[in-house]
Design a protein with these regions (language model features):
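Bacterial N-terminal signal peptides
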Residues: 8-15
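Bacterial N-terminal signal peptides that target proteins for export
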Residues: 1-7
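Electron-transfer interface patches adjacent to heme c in soluble/periplasmic c-type cytochromes
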Residues: 23-73, 83-140, 147-151, 157, ...
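An amphipathic alpha-helix/helix-turn recognition signal
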Residues: 73-74, 166
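Sec/Tat signal peptide C-region and signal peptidase I cleavage site
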Residues: 16-22
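Solvent-exposed, charged amphipathic helical/linker segments at domain boundaries
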Residues: 152-170
Length: 293
């Protein structure tokens, strides 16, 4: 960890952070260029496979797991819940094959909509109690919707609207800003130190990260099994909301979505981060849900 701290500090100084006044198009071009240079030979679409695009040994192991994926039961149960809550009538195309367009900016409300938030809104609209947003049922529903969108190309639109750009830039600032006792940013781990080890885990490239959410993590599955005695259909699942909070916790920063208020609602800071973060994977095909470390 000490070596990683030193490397991250040096690389964040030497690296090429995205310009504050750059357009979303310029941001995407620079973001891709950084990773193409850092990992020569890795094609754009392969970045959607996370660490398995940069580590051949881990890739072989992952491919073996994907032959009998542990998330299949979760997809099936997520589909059943999708139907139970009547979600098809709230989404275009009945909620199938639409994840590639999320998050999106709504010009009428001036807000960014995430898939998780729209699922929650529909559940409440249909007279049901809201769900927790980090894991469990909502992660299973999102996993099913992601599965129906596999192969679709990520296409987050950042319109030339001051309100949309303000949210986008808020997320961009969060991605590059250092925080917590470890003084790490998202970019420190997933740009400058990507491909290095930290606490036994290989740090994944930021490019393509959002293409496979919600994810089924072995770490989360083990935690569920230890607590409940079994993993269950949703035990290994987590939304990107869960991952953001976990990352903040790991760098000993304030977890913004912690507490009763944020159990069933998304923190605007994480919405902004998801808007920027996902747009940096535009052009990459969705492949979620997926197994991760």
């Amino acid at each position: 960890m000490k070596r990683l701290l030193i490397a991250a500090t040096a690389l964040s100084i030497m690296g090429l952070p995205l310009l504050a006044n750059a357009s979303p198009k310029q941001d995407l071009e620079q973001f891709r260029a950084y990773f193409f240079k850092k990992f020569p030979g890795v094609k754009l679409q392969d970045f959607g496979n996370g660490i398995y695009a940069i580590d051949p040994v881990r890739r072989d192991e992952w491919q073996n797991i994907e032959e009998f994926p542990p998330y299949e039961a979760g997809i099936d149960k997520g589909k059943a819940l999708f139907n139970k809550y009547g979600l098809a009538k709230c989404f275009k195309n009945g909620g199938k094959g639409i994840k590639q367009n999320y998050p999106y900016f709504d010009s009428k409300s001036g807000k960014v909509h995430t898939l998780i938030a729209d699922i929650q809104a529909c559940i409440v609209k249909n007279g049901h109690k809201p769900l927790g947003l980090k894991k469990g049922k909502i992660a299973g529903i999102a996993a099913y919707m992601a599965y129906t969108s596999r192969g679709k190309v990520q296409n987050v639109v950042i319109p030339n609207d001051k309100r949309a750009l303000k949210i986008y830039n808020r997320g961009k600032t969060h991605f590059y800003a250092k925080r917590g006792q470890l003084n790490f940013s998202c970019a420190d781990c997933h740009m400058y130190s990507s491909g290095q080890m930290a606490r036994g885990n290989l740090l994944s490239p930021g490019l393509g990260q959002t293409s496979h959410f919600p994810v089924w993590r072995r770490k989360w599955a083990k935690k569920t099994a230890a607590k409940k005695g079994k993993v269950g259909a949703f035990g290994g699942f987590g939304t990107i909301e869960r991952r953001y909070g976990g990352c903040n916790k790991q760098v000993r920063a304030k977890v913004l979505n912690k507490g009763k208020k944020w159990k069933t609602a998304q923190h605007p800071e994480y919405v902004a981060l998801e808007y920027f973060h996902t747009s940096m994977s535009n052009g990459i095909k969705l492949n979620g849900p997926a197994v991760r470390q």
